[in-house]
Amino acid sequence: MKVLLDATAIPADLGGVGRYVDDLVPELIASGVNLAMAVQQRDVAHFSAKVPRAHLFPVSQSMESRGARMAWEQTGLPALIHRIRPDVLHSPHYTFPALHQVPVVVTLHDATFFSHPQAHSPFKQKFF
């Protein structure tokens, strides 16, 4: 099975979702998954060493702002899906392309967006 994992949302310090992805990807490879990863340029060396059998696809634009990453997720990620034709897209950070051509697995690490929306900004309340 070919899985495309969108690792573009992980923070530079690999905290939180980054730690989850960091622990997940070697297990996917060990289980026989043909793993492709969309990664930020700054993470190429890390994931090349962590999972040398994964196919890395560095994103070409800066993902420093949330808006830029989300725009890429809705435009660049579908283009990458079309190009490499994975069986499944795994989005480990809540969001995924609105238009997608493959089954999607989304990991929710925190459900308070739904159970306690008042704890989040108005933008996140509406978005999630």
Where in this protein do the model-derived segments appear?
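Carbohydrate transferase catalytic cores enriched for Leloir-type hexosyltransferases
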Residues: 1-128
